[in-house]
Each structure stands twice: as structure tokens, then as C-alpha cells.
Design a protein with these regions (language model features):
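Generic structural signal for small/hydrophobic residues in well-ordered secondary structure
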Residues: 1, 44, 97-100
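Flexible "cap/lid" loop of the alpha/beta hydrolase fold
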Residues: 1-29
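Alpha/beta-hydrolase active-site loop signature
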Residues: 4, 103, 130-133
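Short aromatic-enriched loop/helix-cap "lid" or pocket-rim segments at secondary-structure transitions
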Residues: 8-13, 108-111, 136-138
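Short helix-to-loop capping/linker segments positioned immediately adjacent to catalytic or ligand/cofactor-binding
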Residues: 29-34, 118
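Conserved alpha/beta-hydrolase catalytic His-Asp/Glu region
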Residues: 32-89
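Conserved serine/cysteine hydrolase catalytic core
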Residues: 69-116, 125
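Catalytic active-site module of serine/aspartate enzymes centered on a nucleophile-bearing elbow/loop
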Residues: 119-153
């Protein structure tokens, strides 16, 4: 979530993505095997989505490659940690804030403070959805993007 939506700041000094990047750098060399072994797939995805068993090989492969190549979130983490939104988002900028009701990475109780989102934003909670909506509902993701874009025209 944008740092401005956190109720509480995370207790960690380093972002959780650091663990994911290390795991991805190792597992990229045996992705097909890791995907087929439930315990290994669970290590990579169970903390992100309750629907981890349903993830396609393509989604897992793409996420492993992206995390393995990632430079990380440290610059953003250092810049945003402990901050709130500091400027007004003009109403002409249409935006939607989308969370899954099963988001284990950014749960509602610590990371979804609706009161600090721009007043004109659409707050959308997707049922039976985890942190990465495009993994669980790719068609709905496209639909939400199109709806938000149409609001701007």
C-alpha cells in the first residue's frame, strides 16, 4: 500500500521483500521443480495469497524472475517509511484504491487507513482476493483499470 495508508508502521527495519528477493534469487534456478512440490510453492506464496495452490506456473515464473532481478524497495522504503501523504491529489486525477479482503501482506487492521486516502478516490475491496489481485483475478484487474481510466475521460 502507499505508505500513506498505513495505520501503523511495520515493525521491521527492512521490508519483507528482502526475504522474497533472496528466495527468488535461489529458486530461479529450479523453478519448475519448486512449482510442482507443494511445500516449496507454499514457502514462496502462502504468506502472499491464500489461493497459492491455484497460481499458474506462468504467474509464479514471472514473479520469481521479477523478484530475482529486482533491486528492491529499499529506496522507496527509506523515503516513505514513517510518512503520510503530504500533498493534495487533485480531483481531476481519478484513482481507485484496491485491496483484497484476504490480503495477508497488507492486512486491513494495519495497512488500510481509508481516512488518509484522497477523498475522491474509489475504495474497492475484492472478495476472496489476496495481495496481488492480478494473480487471483486478472480479468477483474483489467476491468477495474478500465473503469478508473474511463472516469478520467
Amino acid at each position: 500500500a502507499p505508505a500513506g495508508l498505513w495505520h501503523e508502521q511495520p515493525p521491521r527495519k527492512f521490508p519483507p521483500s528482502l526475504d522474497a528477493r533472496i528466495l527468488a534469487k535461489i529458486s530461479q534456478h529450479f523453478m519448475k521443480t519448486a512449482y510442482r512440490i507443494p511445500v516449496l510453492k507454499a514457502i514462496g506464496y502462502k504468506k502472499i495469497t491464500h489461493l497459492w495452490r491455484e497460481l499458474s506456473f506462468e504467474s509464479c515464473r514471472d514473479s520469481v524472475i521479477a523478484m530475482a532481478r529486482s533491486k528492491g524497495y529499499m529506496p522507496m522504503w527509506h523515503g516513505a517509511n514513517g510518512r503520510r501523504f503530504e500533498s493534495v491529489v487533485p480531483e481531476r486525477v481519478k484513482l481507485s484504491v484496491v485491496f483484497g479482503d484476504e490480503d495477508l501482506t497488507l492486512p486491513e487492521e494495519i495497512a488500510q487507513e481509508k481516512s488518509v486516502a484522497p477523498a475522491h478516490s474509489r475504495w474497492i475491496v475484492v472478495d476472496n482476493c489476496a495481495h496481488v489481485i492480478m494473480w487471483n483475478y486478472p480479468e477483474l484487474t483489467v476491468e477495474l483499470i478500465k473503469k478508473t481510466a474511463l472516469m478520467a475521460s
